[in-house]
Amino acid sequence: MKISEEEVRHVANLSKLRFSDQETKEFASSLSKIVDMIELLNEVDTEGVPVTTTMADRKTVMREDIAQPGNNRDDLFKNVPQHQDYYIKVPAILEDGGDA
């Protein structure tokens, strides 16, 4: 399956990434090869092969959930340069608030 340069540009734009024309071309080529390899896996005969969900022979071990006193908020905010109403103010990273 061929991944077009336009598709790479579209996904890059959604991810707020910018690539040169050469990088876009290389990504399109690399991604096309990756998708082709994955499509090859669909051709593998798995008839009679037991389903494997994990190779680890472990079980989830959960600890008892016990509430513990937290930290003092005033102490936590001592080194925060800008805050308001116990929220940390950080610089904007998306132009115009973003569209994501």
From Swiss-Prot:
Q: Which reaction does it catalyse?
A: L-glutamyl-tRNA(Gln) + L-glutamine + ATP + H2O = L-glutaminyl-tRNA(Gln) + L-glutamate + ADP + phosphate + H(+); L-aspartyl-tRNA(Asn) + L-glutamine + ATP + H2O = L-asparaginyl-tRNA(Asn) + L-glutamate + ADP + phosphate + 2 H(+)
Claim: Glycoprotein is one of the keywords in the record: no
Keywords assigned by UniProt, alphabetized: ATP-binding, Ligase, Nucleotide-binding, Protein biosynthesis
* Entry's Gene Ontology BP terms: glutaminyl-tRNAGln biosynthesis via transamidation; regulation of translational fidelity; translation
The Gene Ontology terms for molecular function here are: asparaginyl-tRNA synthase (glutamine-hydrolyzing) activity; ATP binding; glutaminyl-tRNA synthase (glutamine-hydrolyzing) activity
Q: Gene3D superfamilies in the record, alphabetically?
A: Glu-tRNAGln amidotransferase C subunit, N-terminal domain (1.10.20.60)
Enzyme Commission no: 6.3.5.-
Per its UniProt entry, what is the enzyme's top EC class, as one word? ligase
Instruction: Check the record and name the Pfam families matching this protein.
Output: GatC
What the record says about family reads:
Belongs to the GatC family.
* Reported function: Allows the formation of correctly charged Asn-tRNA(Asn) or Gln-tRNA(Gln) through the transamidation of misacylated Asp-tRNA(Asn) or Glu-tRNA(Gln) in organisms which lack either or both of asparaginyl-tRNA or glutaminyl-tRNA synthetases. The reaction takes place in the presence of glutamine and ATP through an activated phospho-Asp-tRNA(Asn) or phospho-Glu-tRNA(Gln).
NCBIfam families for the chain: gatC (TIGR00135)
Instruction: Quote the subunit structure annotation.
Output: Heterotrimer of A, B and C subunits.
Q: What is this protein called?
A: Aspartyl/glutamyl-tRNA(Asn/Gln) amidotransferase subunit C
Q: What species is given as this protein's source?
A: Streptococcus agalactiae serotype III (strain NEM316)
- Gene name of the record: gatC
